[in-house]
């Protein structure tokens, strides 16, 4: 008698809770269905690959004083590397300092004034020497670049005879990236000569160019905010 009453109420309660929780689960599922209708857009956030020169004052005084050409070469190299490997990496001052010291130890550049002995040796250490190379000569400002060329311009400040390197577009007028932000050598000077870097991997030429344009816009926006 007791067992039959127990079984009756047990089954009754079991049916009740099954219906209750099944209903709650269905309601939850309906809520998630609503979220399924929402489309989320993936937004790419591209940060400039190399810090500005003045940010190295505490980390590496040599880079902060003399590192404009070295940083331009790294900037170009990192853009080629991220396009080639489809991996974006923003390097901080600490990482650049370690890389600088490693490249000095291998003879790629001098540690006392950041003079670059071999851009191609730097590219080899970055693993991109088959993708881009430096044409070992100085070109005049009148040089007409190929589509696959990346230009680093050597500017001379007329008022101080100070030299400074920046990355420029193929029109030789647009500054893509300036390690000093807005350097006086660019605003008060002229292009003394050009360093020409040639992309050998034809499959990445357009993507590298597009990424440099994007970084140029990012660079300009950062200057406006500052």
Positions of PLM-derived features:
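Short intrinsically disordered terminal tails
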Residues: 1, 223-226
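Active-site-adjacent structural segments surrounding the nucleophilic cysteine of cysteine proteases
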Residues: 1-108
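Conserved active-site-adjacent core of cysteine acyl-enzyme catalytic domains
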Residues: 3, 78-212, 217
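Detector for intrinsically disordered, low-structure N-terminal pre-sequences
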Residues: 37, 42-44, 195, 207, ...
């Amino acid at each position: 008698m007791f067992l039959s009453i127990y079984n009756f109420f047990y089954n009754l309660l079991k049916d009740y809770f099954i219906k209750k929780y099944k209903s709650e689960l269905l309601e939850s599922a309906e809520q998630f269905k609503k979220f399924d209708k929402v489309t989320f857009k993936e937004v790419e956030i591209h940060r400039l690959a190399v810090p500005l020169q003045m940010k190295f004052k505490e980390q590496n005084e040599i880079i902060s004083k003399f590192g404009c050409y070295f940083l331009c070469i790294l900037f170009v190299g990192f853009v080629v590397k991220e396009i080639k490997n489809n991996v974006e990496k923003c390097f901080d001052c600490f990482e650049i300092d370690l890389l600088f010291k490693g490249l000095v130890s291998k003879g790629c550049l001098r540690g006392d004034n950041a003079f670059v002995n071999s851009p191609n040796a730097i590219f080899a250490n970055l693993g991109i020497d088959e993708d881009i190379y430096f044409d070992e000569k100085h070109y005049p400002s009148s040089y007409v670049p190929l589509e696959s060329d990346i230009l680093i311009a050597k500017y001379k400040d007329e008022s101080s005879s100070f030299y400074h390197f920046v990355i420029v577009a193929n029109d030789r007028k647009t500054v893509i990236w300036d390690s000093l932000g807005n350097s006086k050598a660019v605003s008060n000077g002229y292009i003394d000569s050009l360093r020409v870097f040639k992309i050998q991997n034809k499959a990445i030429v357009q993507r590298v160019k597009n990424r440099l344009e994007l970084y140029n816009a990012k660079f300009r926006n950062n200057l406006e905010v500052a």
